[in-house]
Structures are given as structure tokens and as C-alpha cells.
Design a protein with these regions (language model features):
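Conserved active-site tyrosine of GNAT-family acetyltransferases
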Residues: 18-23, 89, 116
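Conserved beta-strand-loop-alpha-helix junction that forms the acyl-donor binding cleft
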Residues: 12-14, 37-38
């Protein structure tokens, strides 16, 4: 029956700017780029070697409902060495919200893409 999730959408104000951030800053690979009948491109990026892709879709980015306290990330990216990943991304201009936060199960480090979509890195123990 159901086998796997293959796409999720991240709403962006400028597809080219978002593509540059996800490929040149985060190191994702460009996936599919096809025009659609109604105008915007169907544009995806993915972590190297994975089937799961993010659709960079025109829309109202980073506009979730206001919440109290910590806001969950739009998505989480797994890493084996969060300190090295934070250092590398910081050198490419990424600004982390609160640095690396330790939990009993591992570590998280949150940041935002150029459109304000919340992302986080995760390292499990």
C-alpha cells in the first residue's frame, strides 16, 4: 500500500535564491526542475543519495501560526558531527538561533533559510 514520503514543500519568495541557499550553502543537490502549466517551476533539492526531496515552491514563506515558546522546525537534517556542521555552515553565512543545544538523546542546532523557514540539525548520541 503506502511505501514512502517523497516530497514536502518549503514555501519560498524567490526560487533561484532558495536554490542557491540549499545547494551552495547547505550542500543539497538539485533534483527536478520542470515548468508547470500555471507558471511556477516544480523545483526540488535533496540531500545527496536520498529519495526524499524538498519542493521549493513560491508562496508565503516562514508564515506559520504564532506559538508560545520554542517553535518546531519545518524539517530536521541529520548529521553525525553537529559541531563540524555548525562550524561549516556558519562559515557560509548561516546564523544559528541558540548554538548547539544538548538533550538527553543528542543535540539540536536551529537556524532559518533566507525566507524565514525554520530548520534544524540533529545529532543523536
Amino acid at each position: 500500500m503506502l511505501e514512502k514520503v517523497v516530497y514536502t514543500s518549503v514555501f519560498v519568495s524567490d526560487q533561484d535564491k532558495a536554490l542557491d541557499f540549499y545547494t551552495n550553502v547547505l550542500g543539497f543537490e538539485k533534483g527536478v526542475e520542470n515548468p508547470t502549466p500555471d507558471g511556477p517551476r516544480f523545483l526540488t533539492v535533496a540531500v545527496n543519495g536520498q529519495d526524499f526531496q524538498l519542493v521549493l515552491w513560491p508562496g508565503t514563506p516562514g508564515q506559520g501560526q504564532p506559538v508560545q515558546g520554542r517553535i518546531p522546525a519545518a524539517y530536521t537534517i541529520e548529521t553525525r558531527d553537529i559541531r563540524q556542521a555548525v562550524e561549516a555552515l556558519t562559515s557560509r553565512g548561516v546564523k544559528f538561533d541558540n548554538g548547539i543545544v544538548e538533550y538527553p538523546w543528542g543535540y539540536l542546532a536551529g537556524f532559518q533559510d533566507p525566507d524565514g523557514n525554520r530548520l534544524q540539525l540533529r545529532e543523536l548520541r
